[in-house]
A protein has these predicted regions:
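RNase H-like nuclease fold core
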Residues: 94-147
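Acidic, metal-ion-coordinating active-site neighborhood of RNase H-like domains
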Residues: 44, 106-113, 220-232, 236
Length: 239
């Protein structure tokens, strides 16, 4: 049996791309979503895509004992709760202090049906691999897995460079399609992912040194569960 080290592929430290700069907007773009899923995504954006903060706020805003994923919660109740939250003073949770200027970023995308309801997840860790942020969002109601993987990387990088000034970054990711585009210099092979690819390049421009670790399917990825919740939100309908 191969060791964990043998089951990953690593690339040497990258250098800062020339001529790139800037990061994506606070509210990240998405594929087609139902009106309800769009409202949830807006709430997520208001709290910096912190999944727990968003779902807790939504659950508290829904009357009675219902919640975001409670089958007894009607679409009307959910819509009213989301609209009330967006009209309130929602804010990002306090930013955790990192240990040093090196970071680890786990990312993952999930698509049911490929294409189907898709979500993105990302976990930001510091040099000691203490968790700083658990992020998630819906990507689209009929999006492919590769699109979700690009969206996950964009999500994690956007929040990382918004909150911190990373000097070194290790991205842990299982998508070779994204790896070959971002670090291998290949053109995107998935139709329609160019905006995500360009946003990733722009975010990486602010990180002087970065590398990737390719995760095997058997390697643990804490971003997976967040991507799954994002896909659950993307499945909200109708529309």
């Amino acid at each position: 049996m191969r060791s964990a080290d043998e089951r990953v592929q690593k690339r040497a430290w990258g250098t800062r791309p020339k001529g790139a700069g800037g990061v994506s907007d606070n509210h990240l773009p998405s594929e087609h979503l139902s009106p309800l899923a769009k409202l949830v995504d807006k709430v997520l954006a208001q709290v910096g895509y912190e999944m727990v903060a968003a779902t807790d706020a939504i659950d508290d805003a829904i009357p009675g004992y219902g919640g975001l994923f409670d089958p007894t919660t009607t679409s009307g109740e959910l819509q009213r709760a989301l609209e009330q939250l967006l009209a309130s003073d929602l804010s990002r949770p306090a930013t955790s202090d990192p240990a040093g200027e090196r970071f680890v970023l786990y990312v993952d995308g999930s698509s049911r049906g490929n294409p189907g309801p898709a979500g993105a997840g990302a976990v930001i860790m510091d040099a000691e691999e203490d968790v700083l942020a658990r992020l998630g969002r819906p990507v689209g109601s009929r999006a492919g897995n590769n699109t979700a993987e690009y969206a996950a990387l964009q999500l994690g990088l956007s929040e990382l460079v918004t909150r911190y000034e990373p000097h070194r970054l290790e991205v842990r990711i299982d998508s070779m399609t994204v790896i070959q585009d971002v670090w291998g210099g290949d053109d995107p092979t998935e139709p329609g992912v160019e905006p995500y690819s360009e946003a990733v390049a722009a975010a990486l421009a602010s990180v002087p040194n970065h590398e990737y670790t390719h995760l095997a399917d058997s390697d643990p990825n804490p971003a997976d569960a967040l991507a799954t919740v994002g896909a659950d939100i993307a499945a909200f309908g109708p529309g």
